[in-house]
């Protein structure tokens, strides 16, 4: 067993240091950015804020609201194909992600959703434990199946696993285990990592 005894930080531990600016008002700040990705030729422009793929936040209703502001929603994986069919016309494909799990049924559902609108660029592969070896293999399989999609994978919290997922074909890695306000992973399982340090370290992968 190895114990890490250096200081790790959460967002509550830090403040943003002010600095000189040429802006007169916060309303002048432009949040939109242009993005390119490692494994696909797809590009994206918008505000890089994602609503998570939880069943309470990654909803069609959330997506309709956030797309007006060029923000993204990872639609949760519990919707059926029929529910997708009923809502697909209300969704801007630039600002949503399909979410799937690891099973063959998930893979097939992903294919069928993209058949409804192949302009959807994002595919989120979501599992409870991103540290399993079979998850890395699943990311490789999804990359081979959807070579032009922007693939998101997670969750993990450390640099070495972030690197493994990127090498397997992920363009974006979801960072964080247990930081959510209602998440019980840390209190029940004792597993996690202070979120700010986790993001900082994983960004070097």
Region spans (language model):
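Active-site entrance/lid segments in N-terminal catalytic domains of soluble metabolic enzymes
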Residues: 1-205
